Amino acid sequence: MAKLSTDELLEAFKDLTLIELSEFVKKFEETFEVTAAAPPVAVAAAPAAGGAGAAAEDAEQKDSFDIVLESVDASKKIQVIKEVRALTSLGLGEAKALVDGAPSTVLEGANKEAADKAKTQLEGAGGTINLK
């Protein structure tokens, strides 16, 4: 097999969809027994807070979110597919498969503003969204 340069690899990755890239990363991690996750950062322990207050604080402090499409109103499925395509730049077939496979992750690692915007758009189109 010919050795590919970094630039050639990047060009090949540009042609892949987000789903294909995600599958590639998983295979890469398994093959080389590595992880693409950032190393954990030590944080000073905060005093324990009770129940929902702690969950709300965690959500406020969190800086990246996964947008999960939990379910779709059957009568608004087409609008949800259009929004998924607009948010992810997936093709029609991939977006339809993602919507049909709910619950499924639409976006991973989005910042708070992007996550809120995506949630608003998808809920407006007829989807039930959960931010994780």
Swiss-Prot record:
GO biological process: translation
Keyword terms of this UniProt record: Ribonucleoprotein, Ribosomal protein
GO cellular component: cytosolic large ribosomal subunit
A Pfam family annotated for this UniProt entry: Ribosomal_L12_N
Chain segments carrying region Disordered: 112-132
A GO MF label: mRNA binding
InterPro entries named in the record: Ribosomal_bL12, Ribosomal_bL12_C, Ribosomal_bL12_C/ClpS-like, Ribosomal_bL12_oligo, Ribosomal_bL12_oligo_N_sf
Family: Belongs to the bacterial ribosomal protein bL12 family.
General function of this protein: Forms part of the ribosomal stalk which helps the ribosome interact with GTP-bound translation factors. Is thus essential for accurate translation.
Cross-referenced PANTHER family: 39S RIBOSOMAL PROTEIN L12, LARGE RIBOSOMAL SUBUNIT PROTEIN BL12M
Subunit structure of this chain's protein: Homodimer. Part of the ribosomal stalk of the 50S ribosomal subunit. Forms a multimeric L10(L12)X complex, where L10 forms an elongated spine to which 2 to 4 L12 dimers bind in a sequential fashion. Binds GTP-bound translation factors.
Protein name: Large ribosomal subunit protein bL12
Source organism per UniProt: Leifsonia xyli subsp. xyli (strain CTCB07)
